[in-house]
Amino acid sequence: MPLEESGENTPLLRGEIISDGDTDRSRWRSIRVMYFTMFLSSVGFTIVITSIWPYLKKIDESADASFLGWVVAAYSLGQMVASPFFGLWSNHRPRREPLVCSIFINVSANIYYSYVYLPPSHNQIHMLLARTFVGIGAGNVAVVRSYVAGATSLKERTSAMANMSACQALGFILGPALQAVLSFIGETGVSVDVIKLQVNMYTAPALLAACFGVINILLVILVLREHSVDDHGNRIRPINYTPEERVDVPPEVEGDIDHIAVFTSNVLFFIILFIFAVFETISTPLSMDMFAWTRKEAVLYNGIILAAIGFESILVFLVVKVVSARVGDRPLLLGGLILIFVGFFMLLPWGNQYPKIQWTDINNNTIPPIQLAPTPASNSSLEPIGCPSEQTWCLFTPVIHLAQYITSDILIGVGYPTCNVMSYTLYSKILGPKPQGVYMGWLTASGSGARTLGPVFVSHFYTILGPRWAFSAICGIVLAAIVMLSAMYKRLVAFSIRHGRIAE
């Protein structure tokens, strides 16, 4: 198919050389399917994140916050293992194959999660396995990012990546929001005896995520087509094209990839995902300890808070698309890291007020929490609330106030989405027109490794030493990321700019 110039109007910019109108419409339909796939991946993680802790306690009373860290990390561990594999697969075969396979795994794993209460023993292990398989299914994020990077020109890419991040944020919003709505089903819910399924506030979100997955499989099969363009917008043959897709093949792209910049980008992405995984994991236990919320209150209120952060993120992505065109990607990345640092600094405990303590007697039975002032009788509950006395730091660590918590949420809600979209947008530009499947697999694995280590780190650190030490350590990590970005600032440039093909 000969290359020809488009008209003035393109989906995101004007005056670029692309293929004919039908092919271009097909290209953007396929990119939108990738947006939905990213949305599904985000929903698969967040739709249960606020209810994992109370669900875990319901199926196994002996589970502690340390095991919660492993359950949350299991998703990311599965994604970390699967991402390079799916990325390699997508470099050599049509992307439909790894996408359909991964989404099917995701659907099956969410159904498995809905049944983890059923076995007579080892329920917490079943939950761990279910979340691991959900994570393996989410390994297709590498395929999604490499597809969007390869199907957009250099000028289109920041906007396309911001759109993809907005879809990810929408999943981030709808996940906790749906969990908050479904919390009204209650812990008992409805029993479907024929298939031995309990539909309640813990299982309904996972079942809904499975339904989204079925829709996604149909879209991938019926709508997705392989498309690829170079940095200037010229259509090229994808490395994994099928014979019926006849396109002109340009000369081999000359120039090497800056592997130091690639390594730096992976480290920065790891840190960005690590610190947000810490924030996601600790929100429910922290709020239950500091604000004496019940399990149901923690699920509802944190669901609302995380949904609000998601809406904030979408606004951030809209602003980022405009601002990045004026100031560039790197200044936005640096600014986002500074906001995250301030957000975690706000979470450090100050003052001389202390949280309500949840005491236990010598038989390990819970005693109602200490009340420092008279409270209405309606506040008391059979469910133990407050900061557990077995966490010794509860006795001497000042309380974190709700205003601190909300302010921190707002700051991190601006800083994280900015860093997220800028980091992998920069990464895709550094790689240039080379096949990106494997490289995106490593980037996704890097982020998944962060999501694996982050929850384990914070659950142990928080349980043993408390929020003061946990959040001080996070502030130190963010500061190290700021220093690294500043030191490598000049190397983090697009492939075509580095080789002088496009002016910066």
Curated annotation (Swiss-Prot):
State the compartments where it is located.
Answer: Lysosome membrane
Family matches, as SUPFAM superfamilies: MFS general substrate transporter
**Cytoplasmic face: residue ranges?**
1-32, 88-97, 145-169, 225-258, 324-330, 490-504
Pfam families in UniProt: MFS_1 (PF07690)
The residues that cross the membrane are: 33-53, 67-87, 98-118, 124-144, 170-190, 204-224, 259-279, 303-323, 331-351, 469-489
Record keywords, A-Z: Glycoprotein, Lysosome, Membrane, Transmembrane, Transmembrane helix, Transport
Q: For the motif Dileucine internalization motif, what are the positions?
A: 12-13
Q: Which GO terms describe its cellular component?
A: lysosomal membrane
Keyword presence, Membrane = yes
Any single biological process term in GO: autophagosome maturation
- Give the record's membrane topology: Multi-pass membrane protein
Record has Ion transport as a keyword: no
User: What InterPro entries does this protein's entry cite?
Assistant: MFS, MFS_dom, MFS_Domain-Containing_Protein, MFS_trans_sf
**Topological domains (Extracellular): residue ranges?**
54-66, 119-123, 191-203, 280-302, 352-468
Molecular function, one GO term: chloride channel activity
Q: Which residues are glycosylated?
A: N364
Q: What does this protein do?
A: May be a carrier that transport small solutes by using chemiosmotic ion gradients.
The similarity annotation says: Belongs to the major facilitator superfamily.
Query: What name has this protein been given in UniProt?
Result: Major facilitator superfamily domain-containing protein 8
